[in-house]
């Protein structure tokens, strides 16, 4: 008789305090009124209440709400996507200006159905924010765009303040975790972005708790640094539903602190590491630190 897979109990340090105030309800109302999507909601981010209610920040998700991929860790809907909304860039920019955001993060579903991977709408969103909210710093978080570097150039030519592309997991687990992406393509994507705009900080994140080893996590650090990535984020994988990959381990906060110490010693300009850390967590602080380091090196 097959042994039943053991359930890993969620520890107390992952319990989240839900802050719901006027900021939270106001942001949610604004998103719905403008027909906008956020990865905060779609990916069930554990920090949504802190970011919306306390920090008043949000990560906009453009190119629709349906992804053409089906990564086994991600809660975003998958299937046949809708037509591109060419008015979306202006609505996002209007919301950024209305919210008076210091830092805006723009991510997107993967659009493998589009020849340009959605790069044109992505780029126009950056340009629209620059026009309507010129003092807002902008972080872009695209998919690998199928490895089409002309599409990446379209985005990098807008000169975002940070280019973020997540490698998500260690090399060994990549085929299981995100079957339609590759570890090496993500590394090349990050390297090419830096080659196109050497002064723009690049960033990548991984989730841990999927069965990786500490040595494999450190290997990811080395691989990112070898491809000139400046900023790294490390967070705990949380299973969005029973259909997704199970959590193999919950890392203690002390283990995250050790990983951050290792990453910083290796040479990252910034590393955010913790159980609830996600790619966009405290992104406004990261762009400031990266800018200071660039100025010091100039």
Swiss-Prot record:
So, what pathway does this thing act in?
Protein modification; protein lipoylation via endogenous pathway; protein N(6)-(lipoyl)lysine from octanoyl-[acyl-carrier-protein]
* EC number(s) per entry: 2.8.1.8
Q: Give the Gene Ontology MF terms in alphabetical order.
A: 4 iron, 4 sulfur cluster binding; lipoate synthase activity; metal ion binding
Enumerate the InterPro entries for this protein. Aldolase_TIM, Elp3/MiaA/NifB-like_rSAM, LIAS_N, Lipoyl_synth, rSAM
Q: Where in the cell is it found?
A: Cytoplasm
Q: Which top class of enzyme applies to this chain? A: transferase
Keywords from the named record:
4Fe-4S, Cytoplasm, Iron, Iron-sulfur, Metal-binding, S-adenosyl-L-methionine, Transferase
Any one GO cellular component localisation term in the record = cytoplasm
Q: How is the cofactor bound?
A: Binds 2 [4Fe-4S] clusters per subunit. One cluster is coordinated with 3 cysteines and an exchangeable S-adenosyl-L-methionine.
Q: What positions does the domain Radical SAM core occupy?
A: 53-269
In this chain, [4Fe-4S] cluster 1 is annotated as bound at: 40, 45, 51, 280
Q: State the reactions this protein catalyses.
A: [[Fe-S] cluster scaffold protein carrying a second [4Fe-4S](2+) cluster] + N(6)-octanoyl-L-lysyl-[protein] + 2 oxidized [2Fe-2S]-[ferredoxin] + 2 S-adenosyl-L-methionine + 4 H(+) = [[Fe-S] cluster scaffold protein] + N(6)-[(R)-dihydrolipoyl]-L-lysyl-[protein] + 4 Fe(3+) + 2 hydrogen sulfide + 2 5'-deoxyadenosine + 2 L-methionine + 2 reduced [2Fe-2S]-[ferredoxin]
**From which domain of life does this come?**
Bacteria
Q: Does the keyword 4Fe-4S apply?
A: yes
Q: Which SUPFAM superfamilies match?
A: Radical SAM enzymes
Pfam families in alphabetical order: LIAS_N, Radical_SAM
**Co-factor requirement:** [4Fe-4S] cluster
**Residues bound to [4Fe-4S] cluster 2:** 67, 71, 74
Q: Which CDD domains match?
A: Radical_SAM (cd01335)
Which family is this protein grouped under? Answer: Belongs to the radical SAM superfamily. Lipoyl synthase family.
Official protein name in the record: Lipoyl synthase
Its gene name is lipA
């Amino acid at each position: 008789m097959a042994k039943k897979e053991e359930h890993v109990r969620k520890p107390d340090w992952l319990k989240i305090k839900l802050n719901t105030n006027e900021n939270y309800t106001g942001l949610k109302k604004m998103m719905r009124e403008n027909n906008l999507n956020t990865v905060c909601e779609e990916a069930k981010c554990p920090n949504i209440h802190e970011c919306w209610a306390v920090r008043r920040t949000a990560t906009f998700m453009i190119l629709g709400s349906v992804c053409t991929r089906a990564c086994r860790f991600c809660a975003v809907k998958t299937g046949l996507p809708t037509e591109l909304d060419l008015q979306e860039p202006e609505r996002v920019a209007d919301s950024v200006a209305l919210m008076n955001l210091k830092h805006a993060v723009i991510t997107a579903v993967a659009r493998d159905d589009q020849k340009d991977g959605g790069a044109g709408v992505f780029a126009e969103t950056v340009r629209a924010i620059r026009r309507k909210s010129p003092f807002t710093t902008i972080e872009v978080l695209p998919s690998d765009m199928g490895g089409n570097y002309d599409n990446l150039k379209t985005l990098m030519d807008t000169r975002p303040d940070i280019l973020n592309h997540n490698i998500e997991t260690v090399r060994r687990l990549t085929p299981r975790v995100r079957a339609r992406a590759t570890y090496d393509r993500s590394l090349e994507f990050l390297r090419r972005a830096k080659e196109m705009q050497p002064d723009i900080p690049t960033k990548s994140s991984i989730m841990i708790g999927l069965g990786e080893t500490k040595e494999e996590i450190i290997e990811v650090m080395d691989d990112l640094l070898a491809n000139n990535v400046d900023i790294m984020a490390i967070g705990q994988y949380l299973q969005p539903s029973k259909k997704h990959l199970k959590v193999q381990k919950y890392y203690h906060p002390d283990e995250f602190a050790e990983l951050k110490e290792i990453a910083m010693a290796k040479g990252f300009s910034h590393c955010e590491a913790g159980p609830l850390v996600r790619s966009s967590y405290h992104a406004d602080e990261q762009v400031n630190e990266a800018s200071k380091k660039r100025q010091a090196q100039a």
